[in-house]
From Swiss-Prot:
Protein name: NADPH-dependent 7-cyano-7-deazaguanine reductase
Enzyme Commission (EC) number: 1.7.1.13
Positions bound to substrate: 53-55, 72-73
Family in the record: Belongs to the GTP cyclohydrolase I family. QueF type 1 subfamily.
Main function: Catalyzes the NADPH-dependent reduction of 7-cyano-7-deazaguanine (preQ0) to 7-aminomethyl-7-deazaguanine (preQ1).
Disulfide bonds: none
InterPro entries for this protein: GTP-CH-I_C/QueF, NADPH_dep_7-cyano-7-deazaG_red, QueF, QueF_type1
Gene3D superfamilies xref list: 3.30.1130.10
Protein backbone atom coordinates (compact mmCIF):
# COMPACT_ATOMS: atom_id res chain seq x y z
CA UNK A 1 0.00 0.00 0.00
CA UNK A 2 1.32 3.40 -0.95
CA UNK A 3 1.22 5.69 2.06
CA UNK A 4 2.55 8.42 -0.25
CA UNK A 5 -1.01 8.71 -1.63
CA UNK A 6 -2.17 10.21 1.67
CA UNK A 7 -2.40 14.00 1.51
CA UNK A 8 -3.04 16.39 4.38
CA UNK A 9 -4.12 19.98 4.89
CA UNK A 10 -3.46 22.40 7.74
CA UNK A 11 -5.70 22.10 10.77
CA UNK A 12 -7.40 25.47 11.21
CA UNK A 13 -7.93 24.81 14.95
CA UNK A 14 -4.68 23.21 16.20
CA UNK A 15 -5.14 24.53 19.74
CA UNK A 16 -8.47 22.75 20.19
CA UNK A 17 -9.10 19.06 20.81
CA UNK A 18 -11.89 17.83 18.53
CA UNK A 19 -12.64 14.47 16.99
CA UNK A 20 -12.89 13.60 13.31
CA UNK A 21 -14.61 10.34 12.37
CA UNK A 22 -14.37 9.00 8.83
CA UNK A 23 -16.32 5.89 7.80
CA UNK A 24 -15.82 3.87 4.62
CA UNK A 25 -18.64 1.27 4.43
CA UNK A 26 -17.43 -0.13 1.07
CA UNK A 27 -13.87 -1.28 1.78
CA UNK A 28 -12.68 -4.34 -0.15
CA UNK A 29 -9.61 -6.54 -0.10
CA UNK A 30 -8.79 -10.17 -0.90
CA UNK A 31 -8.37 -13.10 1.49
CA UNK A 32 -4.75 -14.26 1.12
CA UNK A 33 -5.74 -17.88 1.81
CA UNK A 34 -8.72 -18.30 -0.53
CA UNK A 35 -8.39 -15.45 -3.01
CA UNK A 36 -12.02 -14.54 -2.31
CA UNK A 37 -13.05 -10.91 -1.80
CA UNK A 38 -13.46 -9.52 1.71
CA UNK A 39 -15.92 -6.71 2.42
CA UNK A 40 -15.72 -4.45 5.41
CA UNK A 41 -16.28 -1.08 7.01
CA UNK A 42 -13.26 1.00 8.01
CA UNK A 43 -13.70 3.67 10.69
CA UNK A 44 -10.98 6.21 11.46
CA UNK A 45 -11.47 8.28 14.59
CA UNK A 46 -8.77 10.82 15.42
CA UNK A 47 -7.95 14.04 17.22
CA UNK A 48 -5.79 16.04 14.82
CA UNK A 49 -2.74 18.04 15.75
CA UNK A 50 -1.29 20.23 13.00
CA UNK A 51 -2.88 18.56 9.95
CA UNK A 52 -6.01 16.69 8.83
CA UNK A 53 -6.39 13.97 6.20
CA UNK A 54 -7.65 14.97 2.76
CA UNK A 55 -10.58 12.67 1.91
CA UNK A 56 -10.02 12.17 -1.83
CA UNK A 57 -6.47 10.99 -1.16
CA UNK A 58 -7.80 8.63 1.52
CA UNK A 59 -10.26 7.17 -0.98
CA UNK A 60 -7.46 6.43 -3.46
CA UNK A 61 -5.29 5.02 -0.67
CA UNK A 62 -8.09 2.62 0.28
CA UNK A 63 -8.38 1.47 -3.35
CA UNK A 64 -4.79 0.19 -3.10
CA UNK A 65 -6.12 -2.63 -0.89
CA UNK A 66 -8.79 -3.76 -3.38
CA UNK A 67 -6.72 -6.49 -5.04
CA UNK A 68 -4.26 -7.08 -2.20
CA UNK A 69 -4.18 -10.46 -0.46
CA UNK A 70 -3.95 -9.34 3.16
CA UNK A 71 -5.34 -10.43 6.54
CA UNK A 72 -7.77 -8.22 8.50
CA UNK A 73 -5.29 -7.64 11.31
CA UNK A 74 -2.62 -6.54 8.84
CA UNK A 75 -5.01 -4.12 7.12
CA UNK A 76 -5.99 -2.50 10.41
CA UNK A 77 -2.44 -2.06 11.67
CA UNK A 78 -1.07 -0.95 8.28
CA UNK A 79 -3.71 1.77 8.03
CA UNK A 80 -2.93 2.84 11.61
CA UNK A 81 0.82 3.05 10.90
CA UNK A 82 0.35 4.96 7.65
CA UNK A 83 -2.11 7.41 9.20
CA UNK A 84 0.24 8.05 12.14
CA UNK A 85 3.04 8.75 9.67
CA UNK A 86 0.90 11.17 7.63
CA UNK A 87 -0.96 12.94 10.43
CA UNK A 88 1.05 12.74 13.66
CA UNK A 89 -2.34 12.94 15.44
CA UNK A 90 -2.93 13.38 19.14
CA UNK A 91 -4.98 10.18 19.14
CA UNK A 92 -6.08 7.76 16.44
CA UNK A 93 -8.21 4.62 16.43
CA UNK A 94 -8.75 2.41 13.40
CA UNK A 95 -11.62 -0.07 13.54
CA UNK A 96 -12.30 -2.60 10.79
CA UNK A 97 -15.57 -4.53 10.80
CA UNK A 98 -15.75 -7.46 8.39
CA UNK A 99 -18.80 -9.02 6.77
CA UNK A 100 -19.61 -12.61 7.67
CA UNK A 101 -17.63 -15.38 6.05
CA UNK A 102 -18.82 -18.88 6.97
CA UNK A 103 -21.15 -17.34 9.54
CA UNK A 104 -18.32 -15.60 11.41
CA UNK A 105 -17.67 -11.86 11.60
CA UNK A 106 -14.58 -10.13 12.89
CA UNK A 107 -13.84 -6.65 14.23
CA UNK A 108 -10.26 -5.44 14.67
CA UNK A 109 -9.37 -2.25 16.57
CA UNK A 110 -5.91 -0.66 16.83
CA UNK A 111 -5.19 2.59 18.67
CA UNK A 112 -2.47 5.20 19.10
CA UNK A 113 -1.99 8.11 21.48
CA UNK A 114 0.83 10.65 21.23
CA UNK A 115 0.63 10.98 25.03
CA UNK A 116 1.87 7.38 25.29
CA UNK A 117 5.00 8.36 23.33
CA UNK A 118 5.91 11.31 25.55
Amino acid sequence: MKKELLEVFDNQFPDRDYTIEIVNPEFTSVCPKTGLPDFGTITLRYVPDKVCIELKSLKYYYLEFRNAGIFYENITNTILDHMISALHPRTLTVTTEWKARGGITETVTASYSSADKA
